[in-house]
Amino acid sequence: MQQSFSRRTLLRGAAASALALPLSGLASRRASALGRMEPIVSPYGKIAPVKDMTTGLPLLQLPEGFTYQSFGWTGDLMADGSPTPAAHDGMAVVRSRYVNGAPEITLIRNHENGIDTRLGLIKGAAVYDGAEAIVFEDQDENEATGPLSGGNTALIFADGKFTEARPVLAGTVWNCAGGPMPWGTWLSCEEGKYDFTDAGGKPHGYVFEVSPNAGETSAVPIKAMGRFDHEAVAMDPFTGALFLTEDDRNQAGLYKFIPADTSKKLGALEQGGTLWMAKVAGEDKVDLLTPSMGDSYQLEWVQIDDPDLPPQPFTEAPFEADN
């Protein structure tokens, strides 16, 4: 069954029912873990503090014989001389290759920053929203003034060693999670659906495709993927469909995006597509905040006619979790 609604109508009618739970496997694992009270013995032996090979600090506890090294600390200078941004969040290795006979991998990392004069705009990257004088007041009346400090950096490792970091995306807000694409890029998701147009900025709450190659990131939002508090995204390698999660407390949903351009290459997702939202089949307003172990639900997908519709307030209170 496939119906057609605006995202506003769907959220008002289905609210948290869209957060369908195909997670019974996880629930079963948790139930199994609760029934097993004896701790599992590690095959690697006991753990103890081990010093970081980069800083000399005992940051982790590991079994004997294990080593590690940290990299890309906040404030460390990147290849262009600018400081590494703060608030490291979602990341993934998007490319693995050989360069001059040696293995090289590239990791792209989110920086979940909002508006911050101290941090400033990430320099040297492709910029989506470069407004410098945005004033923002949150629901607790905390005020922030300055440029948008979210974005992405790319980190290069050659022959097992960290070699450099460089800025790749700037002018975004609250880049929380995202997901790697099979063709070697990263989708960076904004977890903030703000509109700074009145301050000379732009609307936010989008997904951006980030390339590991210098100069290839377009900083163009993929508006067809919807404007909401994005969390993560993953692609089904068999069908090419992308599945997106939302982090909006008790008002979140599960989405499916079918790209119009199926060439699976950099920039293809920017050509648009169709966005769908999940709901429990045949039912409205199903409270899924407090499921029982083993619960499962049959889903149906409802098409979102206008994925870029400005966020609308709920006309009814969202479900509240039991305390």
Tell what function each PLM region has.
Residues 2, 13, 17-323:
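Conserved small-residue
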